[in-house]
Amino acid sequence: MSKIIGIDLGTTNSCVAVMEGGEPKVIPNPEGNRTTPSVVAFKNEERQVGEVAKRQAITNPNTIMSVKRHMGTDYKVEVEGKDYTPQEISAIILQNLKASAEAYLGETVTKAVITVPAYFNDAERQATKDAGRIAGLEVERIINEPTAAALAYGLEKQDEEQKILVYDLGGGTFDVSILELADGTFEVISTAGDNRLGGDDFDQVIIDHLVAEFKKENNIDLSQDKMALQRLKDAAEKAKKDLSGVTQTQISLPFISAGAAGPLHLELTLTRAKFEELSAGLVERTLEPTRRALKDAGFAPSELDKVILVGGSTRIPAVQEAIKRETGKEPYKGVNPDEVVALGAAVQGGVLTGDVEGVLLLDVTPLSLGIETMGGVFTKLIERNTTIPTSKSQVFSTAADNQPAVDIHVLQGERPMSADNKTLGRFQLTDLPPAPRGIPQIEVTFDIDANGIVNVRAKDLGTSKEQAITIQSSSGLSDEEVERMVQEAEANADADQKRKEEVELRNEADQLVFQTDKVVKDLEGKVDAAEVAKATEAKEALQAAIEKNELEEIRAKKDALQEIVQQLTVKLYEQAQAAAGQAEGAEGAQDAGAKKDNVVDAEFEEVKEDK
C-alpha cells in the first residue's frame, strides 16, 4: 500500500512527516528546513510558497499569510484580478508539502492525514478536506492537533497508563485536550479551545506597542502605512522569539517613515517584563479553556501525569509559567513543539496502512450538535466531548396542525438559544400527510464520522419518507467548484514546473557563456585560431537567443555551444597533462644534474692502528 503522509497545516508554519522503519520522520523542504512558513505570494502570475514568499512580503502586497484563520468562512482574497478562497490558498501550501514528500520518498504521494485544531467546527473541517482534494490528495483522515501530538508522544509509551493534558498554542489557534493512554488506546476525554487565539495575537500586542510609542514621539500613525506595518510585523515576531531566550531585545527599524525634517527611525528596547505585561490578557485567555477541559474530564490537575506543550508559541516563558502554575506540573520538554503534530499525523497514517499496529485512537466532537426547536431553542442531540464516530437519534413532531413540511435547522455550539450558535446547514422534510400537531413522528439522526464531519437525516416514521444532508455550510464548496479548483491547481503546478525549468535553462545558458569565456582565455595562443573563433561565434549566438528569450532557440544554441566547449576543455586538459609531463622530465634531468654537480672529491687515507 502506498504511503500516507501526515501534514500539520498550520496558521504560520506547516510540517510534513511519514512513517519510515516504524518511526515517524519529518520530511525537510527543498531548502533543508523542517517546517515551511504557511505563506503564499503571487508575482507576475508566478506562485511562491514558504520562506521565499515570506522574505518578500514587505515589498509584495500580493502575499497571503495566516489564511487558516479564514477556513470555513466565505472570505476571499483578490490577487491579480482573481478571487481565491482559503481552501485554494491552503491547497497551494499542501501542494508544496506534497512535492517535498514526493522528492524525499522518490514516489508519487496521493494520500494524507491532515490535522486541524480540536476546536474546528464542521465547516472548518470540511474546508480543510476540500483543500486537500484541490491539492490532489485523498484526505484519509482529519485528526485533531492535540490528539496527533499525544499519538507521537505515546507511541513508545503504550505500556504506561497515563492521563495527559496537551496544551496546543499555535500561530492562530489554541486547543487543550485531556487524554487517557492505556494499552495502545489513546482516548480523548475532553477538549476545549479558542480558534481566534495564537502567536499572531502575541505579535499584534508588540506591533500595537511599537505603533503607540512611535506615534507618541513623532505624531505619525504607522498602522496606516502598509509597508511599515509589514516591517513592524517582522520585527515583532523576531522580538517575541528573542525574548524566549533573553530578558531584553533591541528593535531597530531605520527609515520606517519620514517627517518634515527628513527620515525617521524606530529604535526601542523591549524587555521581557514589558512583553509579559502586554500579553498578560492573552495568556489568561488560554487558562479558561484549560480549566473547562479539566472540569469536563472530571479530573483535578493533581491527577495529571504529564503536561505536553505543542506549538511554537508555547516557547514563551510566561505561557510555560502559567500552565505550570495552573496544573502544578512542570511541562514535559521531550517533544519538539513545531514537529510533534505532523509526526502524530504520520503515525495515524501508519495506523491506516497497517504499518503501525496495536494503536486505537478514540477522539471526541469538540462542540455539541443539535437542531432548532419551537421558540428558537437549541436542542442538543450530541453533547460535546462525545467519542466519535457516533450516531444519535431523537423523535420530534410538528408545531402546527396539518403542517406539510418541517425545516431542520442544524447547529453546533453550547448556547441555549439557536441564534447564539453556529449554523451548519438547513434542509426540509416535505410531503407530510395532514395531521394534528404533535401527531407526526419525525426521527432526526445525527452521524459524526471519524473526521468529525456531520451527516444528518430526518425520517417521517409514518410514511418512511426520508431526507438526508451532508452538512455544507454557506462557505462550503460544491463538488463542481472543488473539481474546477483541482484542475486549476494541476494546471498551475504544471505552469510552475515549466517556469522553474525555464529559469534553470536560462541559468545554465548564462553559466555556459561564462565558462566559454574562461576556456577561450585559457587556450589563447595554444589552439588553432579557427577553433577559438568557432566557440566565440557559438557563444554570441547563444547570448542573442538569451536576449530574445526564445526558449527553444536557447536550448538548441546551448547544446551546440556545450559540444564545442567540451572539445576545447578536453584539449585544455591534454595540454595541461603534456606540460606537466614535460615539467616532470625536466625536473628529473635537473635532479640528476644536481646530484652530479654536488659530488665532492675527498682524499682517502688508511689509518693503521698500532697493536
Curated annotation (Swiss-Prot):
The keyword ATP-binding applies. The modification Phosphothreonine is found at T173. It holds the Pfam family HSP70. Residues 577-592 have a biased composition (Low complexity). It comes from the Bacteria. Induction: By stress conditions e.g. heat shock. GO terms for molecular function: ATP binding; ATP-dependent protein folding chaperone; unfolded protein binding. Residues 577-598 are annotated as: Disordered. CDD domains: ASKHA_NBD_HSP70_DnaK-like. Keywords: ATP-binding, Chaperone, Nucleotide-binding, Phosphoprotein, Stress response. InterPro entries: ATPase_NBD, Chaperone_DnaK, Heat_shock_70_CS, HSP70_C_sf, HSP70_peptide-bd_sf, Hsp_70_fam. The keyword Iron-sulfur does not apply. Acts as a chaperone. PANTHER family: HEAT SHOCK PROTEIN 70KDA. Belongs to the heat shock protein 70 family. This is Chaperone protein DnaK. It comes from Bacillus anthracis.
